[in-house]
């Protein structure tokens, strides 16, 4: 049986990475992973937690170029798109597909919808071109479930600033984009969620972190019982 790909999407400061980690912790503490492991004896670890960009050794280098390059070395929009596509092609071929073929479960921080939202709606590149590149990079792979953490753009950017003040870090190249860019990205995610409601579930990320986590866990539990009915026999 092929595994399942769950993707966490959202704009800057939406909390998607935090919620992905909370979901991982819930899968472990609830016993889901232990039960799933019993049904997949040949798979060393039933859960793969990864991200884009940066889910492979090559991807880590590409992530550095994409997010932390010299501000004076302006990356053109098409260059940015192709770098993200290269990261994804390597990621899918070397990590995602092998794990899915073995029946495993994947939690991924960003995937193809981010490219549509950021490079398509945000940068204004051709959506048809992006679709072609995504098809090439993924070899047709799509998420089984995408959780879009929907949050007001200004609220999200303020969250990012507060987080960075606490950590002593700085905004990355994408976060430094003008607010109009981030608003277009948000419009892109909204359009995607409306076009594919059977795949993309919208989560109100303005709620307290614990409430958001609880809603996501309920969604995941329902999906997991559907996807892995053999676990209920244990």
From Swiss-Prot:
Positions contributing to ATP binding: 10-17
Q: What is one GO cellular-component annotation here?
A: cytosol
Q: Which InterPro entries match?
A: P-loop_NTPase, Thymidylate_kin-like_dom, Thymidylate_kin_CS, Thymidylate_kinase
Query: Keywords for this entry?
Result: ATP-binding, Kinase, Nucleotide biosynthesis, Nucleotide-binding, Transferase
- GO molecular function list: ATP binding; dTMP kinase activity
Whether Transferase counts among this entry's keywords is: yes
Q: Which Pfam families match?
A: Thymidylate_kin (PF02223)
Q: What is its EC number?
A: 2.7.4.9
Record field: catalytic activity:
dTMP + ATP = dTDP + ADP
State any GO BP term from the record: dTTP biosynthetic process
Report the top EC class in one word: transferase
State the Gene3D superfamilies in the record. P-loop containing nucleotide triphosphate hydrolases
Tell me, what does this protein do in biology? Answer: Phosphorylation of dTMP to form dTDP in both de novo and salvage pathways of dTTP synthesis.
Q: What family, per the record?
A: Belongs to the thymidylate kinase family.
Query: What's the protein called, per UniProt?
Result: Thymidylate kinase
**What organism is listed for this UniProt entry?**
Cyanothece sp. (strain PCC 7425 / ATCC 29141)
Name of the gene: tmk
């Amino acid at each position: 049986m092929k595994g399942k790909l769950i993707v966490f999407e959202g704009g800057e400061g939406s909390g998607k990475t935090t919620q992905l980690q909370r979901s991982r912790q819930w899968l472990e503490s609830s016993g889901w992973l232990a039960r799933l492991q019993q049904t997949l004896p040949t798979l060393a670890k039933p859960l793969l937690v990864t991200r884009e960009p940066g889910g492979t050794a090559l991807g880590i280098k590409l992530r550095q170029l994409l997010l932390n390059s010299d501000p004076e070395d302006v990356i053109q929009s098409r260059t940015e798109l192709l770098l993200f596509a290269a990261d994804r092609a390597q990621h899918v071929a070397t990590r995602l597909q092998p794990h899915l073929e073995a029946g495993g479960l994947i939690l991924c921080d960003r995937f193809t919808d981010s490219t549509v939202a950021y490079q398509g709606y945000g940068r204004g590149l051709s959506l048809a071109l992006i679709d072609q590149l995504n098809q090439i990079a993924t070899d047709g792979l799509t998420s089984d479930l995408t959780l879009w953490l929907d949050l007001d753009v200004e609220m999200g950017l303020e969250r990012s600033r507060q987080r960075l003040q606490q950590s002593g870090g700085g905004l990355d190249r994408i976060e430094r984009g003008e607010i109009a860019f981030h608003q277009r990205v948000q419009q892109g995610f909204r359009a995607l969620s409306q076009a594919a409601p059977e795949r993309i579930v919208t989560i109100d990320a303005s709620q307290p972190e614990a409430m958001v986590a609880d809603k996501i866990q309920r969604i995941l539990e329902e999906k997991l019982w559907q996807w892995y009915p053999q676990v209920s026999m244990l």
